[in-house]
From Swiss-Prot:
It is found in: Secreted, Extracellular space, Extracellular matrix. This is Uncharacterized protein C6orf15 homolog. It comes from Mus musculus. Keywords: Extracellular matrix, Secreted, Signal. Binds to numerous extracellular matrix proteins.
Amino acid sequence: MQSHAGGSRAPLGLLLICLCLPGLFARSTGAPEEKASPHSGQPSFTSLLNPGQPQPKPDPVNNELLGVLPRLSESPQDGALPEGGSEVPNGPPFWGPPPMESWPSEDPQQGMAAVAEDQLEQMLPEALPYLSRGGRLPEASSARLRQPSLAASYPQDSEAGLQPGSSSLETEAEAFARSPFWFLIHKLLPGSSGRILRPGTSWGSGGAGTGWGTRPMPYPSGIWGSNGLVSGTSLGGRGPYPVRIWGRNGWYPLRILGGNGRYPPVGTWGGYGQYPPVGTWGGYGQYPPVGPWGGYGQYPPVGTWGANCQYPAGSRRPNCRYPAGSWGTKGQNRLPPGAKRPGSSGITP
């Protein structure tokens, strides 16, 4: 019996311990909560468990504040407060985050650089469709870049020191809005010229498409022009090559080949030249075909073989010895050695 009674008491003891443990934990946690609670008007958890103990009276000021807070949350959107809550001070609630003015101020130049980077990052995706054609950005984008939002966010005493930076930033923004493609090229190639490159700007002195520099270049107009050395008018009026040289007063080839030149085809080979075809072979030349072989020449065909010459035409004529005179009349000429006269017996007289 005793063992049976001892075995039945053990579960009952465990059950009582399990029922008492929550109360003990609630009492141990309720004591510090009651000490640290800012609202002393609300009854604590332990006081609710012990109704026999005297409860403290609620504070009327705290109750009034607690009544105002729900009314603030239910107030209209225009910010009008009820008449009973006029004594509540204006400003942020005490449970909100600390105001921005309480934070330590940062360096204004770092903030300016960060804002500029943010603006460029916002503008780059909008400018991508305009890069290939160099068009203008929409008016909203350009107006957003031109807003002087940076100067208004800084104190007045630092305004004078930040004006040059803001003006340069505005200039770059205007250049980017005007021609995004060339602005990015200028940024990617910092060694290029200081001015922003534009496709519509003239590369020369006389407008777009008239030249490749601000000064006259040697190619291609001037050298090929009126007084140049190579083709164009160089091949024209006064250049050394090649038209006038091939013209009337040049060395090669027209006048040289003309009337008074030394070489063919006209003057050299003309009336008073030393070489063929006309003067050299003409009336007063020393070589054929006309003069040397003509009336007063020493060689055939005419003078040499003519009336008073020895060979071969005059030789066959009346006063020559060979061969015409030898075969002529009156027998005054001797026959060749071993020759016989016609009709004779072969005896020489």
